[in-house]
């Protein structure tokens, strides 16, 4: 892609997100979301492949529907209250419509149908942007509106997302679909705790972005899009395969890695709010997600792809070296658990 065009696209992504962050008027916030959506479409379709075209079309139609619903909700709220301010969402119907629209935008269950198919049709770098940066603007709105949103609706969206995210990834062999269902499950944890502790939502979102960034970069270095294609990662780079193992376990939420921290704090907060049953369901759903993370770990570090003795030795391939961004993201993905007491005090 032309560097000038790429610079304009990346700048537009940043501009749209910043407009949503700083905007207090509903039309300004809506414009920021639309700029975000339109800016990523050229990145999605740059491959000129039928799968990329299909994924881009699905993404555009879904985001257009969510944007129309969001605009309708804001107009309804302004009509009933005479106020366009973002923080004056006092109409219960409008607040519910905003929640549904933003859930559709980020891919929460049961509005998740588009995310696995869209992510499967993209390359890994564009998929990384879709799975991380594109979540920031909708979550900025949700964090500002959390006192006015229906807690029961948020709880339903969160619990169903954790269950469907874990269940949907069990039978997948495509890495991008597995990461899509992983994203759905993590978003479920964030939405569940949003009404009770928005600080925990921000913590979970930050750790999710760091761990997802590490995972996508590793798969990009391995040049892998299927489970069976990462079996030779140990041959390409033993160090990177070990990093991938630890990062995937952190995504699964195993102690003593960083990914355990938000799950621990969220389950603790839900129990304090007398929500033991949803907390139990989410803890059990996390085991479903852990199962397909362990499948990836097994394929990455404990298996090798079939290799004929008549072929040249596969260990003579060019060695892969981790870059600075990957090493920093990996460190944050696996080493933050000792900070839990301090973070717990900050989230009170």
From Swiss-Prot:
InterPro entries: Complex_I_Subunit_2 (IPR050175), NADH_DH_su2_C (IPR010933), NADH_UbQ_OxRdtase_chain2 (IPR003917), ND/Mrp_TM (IPR001750). The chain crosses the membrane at residues 3-23, 25-45, 67-87, 95-115, 118-138, 149-171, 178-198, 203-223, 240-260, 274-294, 324-344. It catalyses: a ubiquinone + NADH + 5 H(+)(in) = a ubiquinol + NAD(+) + 4 H(+)(out). Pfam families: NADH_dehy_S2_C, Proton_antipo_M. It is found in: Mitochondrion inner membrane. The keyword Repeat does not apply. Its EC number is 7.1.1.2. It is a multi-pass membrane protein. Its main location: mitochondrion. GO terms for biological process: mitochondrial electron transport, NADH to ubiquinone. GO terms for cellular component: mitochondrial inner membrane. GO terms for molecular function: NADH dehydrogenase (ubiquinone) activity. It comes from the Eukaryota. Keywords: Electron transport, Membrane, Mitochondrion, Mitochondrion inner membrane, NAD, Respiratory chain, Translocase, Transmembrane, Transmembrane helix, Transport, Ubiquinone. Core subunit of the mitochondrial membrane respiratory chain NADH dehydrogenase (Complex I) that is believed to belong to the minimal assembly required for catalysis. Complex I functions in the transfer of electrons from NADH to the respiratory chain. The immediate electron acceptor for the enzyme is believed to be ubiquinone. Belongs to the complex I subunit 2 family. This is NADH-ubiquinone oxidoreductase chain 2. The gene is MT-ND2.
């Amino acid at each position: 892609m032309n560097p000038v065009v790429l610079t304009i696209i990346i700048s537009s992504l940043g501009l749209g997100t910043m407009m949503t962050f700083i905007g207090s008027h509903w039309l300004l916030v809506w414009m920021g979301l639309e700029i975000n959506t339109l800016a990523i479409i050229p990145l999605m379709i740059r491959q000129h492949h039928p799968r990329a075209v299909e994924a881009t079309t699905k993404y555009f139609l879904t985001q257009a529907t969510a944007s129309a619903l969001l605009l309708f909700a804001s107009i309804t709220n302004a009509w009933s209250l005479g106020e366009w301010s973002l923080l004056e969402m006092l109409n219960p119907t409008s607040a519910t419509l905003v929640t549904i629209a933003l859930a559709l935008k980020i891919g929460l269950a049961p509005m998740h149908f588009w995310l696995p198919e869209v992510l499967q049709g993209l390359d890994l770098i564009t998929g990384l942007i879709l799975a991380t940066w594109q979540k920031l603007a909708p979550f900025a709105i949700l964090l500002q509106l959390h006192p006015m949103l229906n807690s029961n609706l948020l709880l339903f969206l969160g619990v169903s997302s954790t269950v469907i995210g874990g269940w949907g990834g069990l039978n997948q062999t495509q890495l991008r679909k597995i990461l899509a269902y992983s994203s759905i499950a993590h978003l479920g944890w964030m939405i569940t705790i949003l009404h009770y502790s928005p600080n925990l939502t921000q913590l979970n979102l930050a750790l999710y972005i760091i761990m997802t960034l590490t995972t996508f970069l590793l798969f990009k270095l391995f040049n892998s899009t299927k489970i069976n294609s990462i079996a030779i990662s140990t041959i390409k780079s033993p160090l990177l395969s070990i990093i991938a193992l630890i990062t995937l376990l952190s995504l699964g939420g195993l102690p003593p890695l960083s990914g355990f921290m938000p799950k621990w704090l969220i389950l603790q907060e839900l129990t304090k709010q007398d929500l033991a049953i949803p907390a139990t369901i989410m803890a059990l759903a996390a085991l479903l997600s852990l199962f397909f993370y362990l499948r990836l770990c097994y394929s990455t570090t404990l298996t090798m792809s079939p290799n004929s003795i008549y072929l040249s030795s596969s260990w003579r391939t060019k060695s892969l070296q981790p870059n600075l961004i990957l090493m920093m993201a990996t460190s944050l993905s696996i080493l933050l658990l000792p900070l839990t007491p301090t973070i717990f005090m900050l989230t009170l």
